[in-house]
């Protein structure tokens, strides 16, 4: 594990340990702090291991590049980039990961939704004509959880 801030590193470890104490094995000597902490965290992994990049996207490409150099498979959260030059850099790094036979995945929650895939296919097949502008909005209310407390009877759902 790695972070720039001690309190965030501690909180991440605490949250992971709380939910799955038997599955979390990150002793203090494998929790790294600082701007180069990502390198220290990857240095303790072996080629073929998996690294999770859940950092702000501005830092994604140097971390991805280092993971490729170390022969690590990568799971990264979206967004992957924030601008054109960085996007081109990520495409180049993606090609390098393919050359090294590394697996790379991105946390795109809608990518595997059958209804959205069908919508994509219909748009691509021209069912709504030529597109000059497309805006999409994801409208959702509060997300439920198995761990959510029940709403008090005197509380409105429209807060």
Each language-model region and where it sits:
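Mobile, glycine-rich extracellular loop/lid and propeptide segments
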Residues: 1, 51, 56-57, 68
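Glycine-rich phosphate-binding loop and adjoining beta1-alpha1-beta2 segment
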Residues: 2-30
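Conserved short alpha-helix immediately C-terminal to the canonical SAM/SAH-binding motif I
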Residues: 5-9, 37, 59
